[in-house]
């Protein structure tokens, strides 16, 4: 017998910006035992992220911005260095990430390559993130970036070796960014 899930109750606790739901479900184990669970699930929609790299200059483009959740959790100034990212908002992942790249970094990149899709915090968050990389060139800079009207985003062009050192030193602590930097390193695209 395989494990089965039966939804008992799905209650919306909050739907201000994203949706917080209280889910009650029965888990029937393989041995037939039924266990009732109650969990809060945060549904913020799915997202996409991209690491821009230049294999000639050996650089990457990251952004620095305030992230309130990190501030609440002890990040003193709330600033986080990360890859460009955004929510899909009914767009296809590649369409979304191209828009975000222009808005946040100012780069209108050519070919983008999807690497993988991952759940970053599946214990309580529904978000599935689509991960991309793209080579960028100075000639593709369409604007200064910095985000839309309610965002304050600093664009960082860093030597790839410096970005890797920032992961080791703890200056970069964003999971999606660490994954993409490690992917770039192990793929040997910067060799």
UniProtKB/Swiss-Prot annotation:
Q: What does this protein do?
A: Nucleoside diphosphate sugar hydrolase that hydrolyzes GDP-mannose as its preferred substrate, yielding GMP and mannose-1-phosphate.
Positions contributing to Mg(2+) 2 binding:
100, 104, 151
Q: What class of enzyme is it?
A: hydrolase
From which source organism is this entry? Salmonella typhimurium (strain LT2 / SGSC1412 / ATCC 700720)
Cellular component terms per the entry's GO annotation? cytosol
* Name this polypeptide is given: GDP-mannose pyrophosphatase
- What does the entry's free-text domain comment contain? In the dimer, the N-terminal domains are swapped between the two monomers, such that residues of both chains contribute to the active site.
- Residues that coordinate or bind GDP-alpha-D-mannose: 17, 38-40, 67, 85-87, 104, 127, 150-151, 176
Question: Which InterPro entries does this chain map to?
Answer: NDP_pyrophosphatase, NUDIX_hydrolase-like_dom_sf, NUDIX_hydrolase_dom
